[in-house]
Amino acid sequence: MSKLEKLVEELSTLSVLEAAELSKLLEEKWGVSAAAPVAVAAAGGAAAAPAEAAEEQTEFTVVLVDGGDKKINVIKEVRGVRPDLGLKEAKDLVEGAPQNVVENVSKQQAEEISKKLTEAGAKIQIK
């Protein structure tokens, strides 16, 4: 197996979050950007305006769509994610679904929070 094939095999085992982190580290080390300005330029000037409008979202909102059957577990996780909430506020948030759990967080934070709440039994949407 060649050096490149071994590297491909190793990279294939990374999770999406690990791959994103690797991408950021390589961008920093090599002083490049993974953005695709070349593709926009190659597409022509007419396509440039829609591409700018469709910029990647940087801030996300985690929405609790449904508390599910295991509301107690979900309430505990909501309190873990939002320590500023008391028990009553967390309970009201879960029972009043759909509700925003957190707003203006990074994609990675939104995915981590979504995973925790989903594992607790909630139905989550990231906007």
Swiss-Prot record:
<dbReference type="InterPro" id="IPR014719">
    <property type="entry name" value="Ribosomal_bL12_C/ClpS-like"/>
</dbReference>
<keyword id="KW-0689">Ribosomal protein</keyword>
<comment type="similarity">
    <text>Belongs to the bacterial ribosomal protein bL12 family.</text>
</comment>
<dbReference type="InterPro" id="IPR036235">
    <property type="entry name" value="Ribosomal_bL12_oligo_N_sf"/>
</dbReference>
<dbReference type="InterPro" id="IPR008932">
    <property type="entry name" value="Ribosomal_bL12_oligo"/>
</dbReference>
<protein>
    <recommendedName>
        <fullName>Large ribosomal subunit protein bL12</fullName>
    </recommendedName>
</protein>
<dbReference type="InterPro" id="IPR013823">
    <property type="entry name" value="Ribosomal_bL12_C"/>
</dbReference>
<dbReference type="Pfam" id="PF16320">
    <property type="entry name" value="Ribosomal_L12_N"/>
</dbReference>
<comment type="subunit">
    <text>Homodimer. Part of the ribosomal stalk of the 50S ribosomal subunit. Forms a multimeric L10(L12)X complex, where L10 forms an elongated spine to which 2 to 4 L12 dimers bind in a sequential fashion. Binds GTP-bound translation factors.</text>
</comment>
<keyword id="KW-0687">Ribonucleoprotein</keyword>
<comment type="function">
    <text>Forms part of the ribosomal stalk which helps the ribosome interact with GTP-bound translation factors. Is thus essential for accurate translation.</text>
</comment>
<dbReference type="GO" id="GO:0006412">
    <property type="term" value="P:translation"/>
</dbReference>
<dbReference type="GO" id="GO:0003735">
    <property type="term" value="F:structural constituent of ribosome"/>
</dbReference>
<dbReference type="GO" id="GO:0022625">
    <property type="term" value="C:cytosolic large ribosomal subunit"/>
</dbReference>
<dbReference type="Pfam" id="PF00542">
    <property type="entry name" value="Ribosomal_L12"/>
</dbReference>
<dbReference type="GO" id="GO:0003729">
    <property type="term" value="F:mRNA binding"/>
</dbReference>
<dbReference type="InterPro" id="IPR000206">
    <property type="entry name" value="Ribosomal_bL12"/>
</dbReference>
